[in-house]
């Protein structure tokens, strides 16, 4: 497996270190609750992306009204502090909605099925996984990855709203980034690209079953790490460009 995915010396060394950290589980403990809740959390997160996109455009809906826009941009701090406050409100709403929704879903799921096997190694389910995590740690990583996806969706919706001046277009295009790109599955020409699309943030559990690694110069990282880092970084320019657009009154 190391020879298959380690196409360079650096990748092979990285895979060796990762597999060396994995401890062979000496006993089995049922972890059905975490195995079921993980994919369900991903699907629920995708639904929250749509809801957050809808609420995001709602925050700036008044600026679509010509009379409201005139008043908003004629004030001293409307184009600056006002725009910044509204953008901040978008991410506060997204954060509160995502974590409250996930907390409620987790309480309902684990309340009914229990939390047995939380500290069991994921190797009991995926023997060839290079991640030395237990089921609880993997679940928390699923939630973190989904949170990054929701923030990125909110940022993209803001940016698209500035450029298209249409709430429907902004929501539709943003949601298609997560729900439409998976339709490329099975097309070999887009396979490498599809593995790094935003929707993969909701496929942490599947990504962990594949020891695929990426190399940038001397830096080697796993797909899960790359996805979280990539879209956390891309969130920054979406916010900056959105702020500049609202500040200039480009709407």
Role assignments for model-derived ranges:
Residues 27, 116-137, 168-172, 177-249:
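Terminal transmembrane helical anchor/hairpin motif
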Residues 64, 70-71:
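Membrane-helix interface linkers and caps
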Residues 73-79:
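Short helix-to-coil transition segments within interhelical loops
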Residues 67-68, 155, 171:
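Transmembrane alpha-helix boundary/hinge residues in polytopic small-molecule transporters
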Residues 79, 166-167:
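Membrane-helix interface/capping residues of multi-pass secondary transporters
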Residues 75, 163-164:
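Transmembrane helix irregularities
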Residues 68, 83-84:
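Alpha-helical transmembrane segments and their immediate interhelical loop/hinge regions
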Residues 1-63, 84-163, 183, 207-216, ...:
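Secretory targeting signals
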């Amino acid at each position: 497996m190391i020879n298959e995915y380690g196409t360079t010396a650096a990748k092979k060394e990285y895979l060796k270190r990762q597999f060396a950290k994995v401890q062979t589980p000496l006993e089995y403990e049922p972890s059905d609750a975490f195995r079921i809740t993980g994919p369900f959390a991903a699907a629920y997160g995708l639904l929250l992306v749509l809801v957050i996109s809808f609420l995001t455009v709602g925050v700036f809906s008044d600026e679509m009204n010509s009379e409201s826009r005139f008043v908003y941009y004629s004030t001293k701090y409307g184009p600056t502090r006002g725009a910044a406050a509204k953008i901040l409100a978008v991410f506060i709403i997204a954060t509160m909605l995502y974590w409250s929704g996930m907390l409620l879903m987790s309480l309902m799921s684990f309340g009914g099925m229990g939390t047995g096997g939380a500290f069991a190694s994921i190797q009991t389910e995926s023997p060839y996984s290079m991640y030395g995590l237990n089921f609880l740690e993997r679940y928390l990583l699923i939630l973190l990855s989904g949170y990054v996806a929701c923030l990125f969706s909110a940022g993209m919706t803001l940016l698209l709203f500035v450029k298209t001046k249409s709430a429907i277009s902004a929501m539709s295009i943003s949601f298609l980034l997560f729900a439409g790109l998976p339709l490329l599955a099975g097309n070999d020409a887009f396979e490498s690209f599809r593995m790094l699309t935003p929707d993969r943030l909701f496929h942490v559990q599947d990504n962990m079953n594949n020891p695929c690694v990426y190399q940038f110069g001397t830096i080697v990282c796993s797909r899960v790490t790359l996805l979280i880092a990539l879209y956390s970084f891309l969130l920054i320019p979406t916010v900056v460009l959105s702020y500049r657009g609202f500040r200039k009154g480009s709407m």
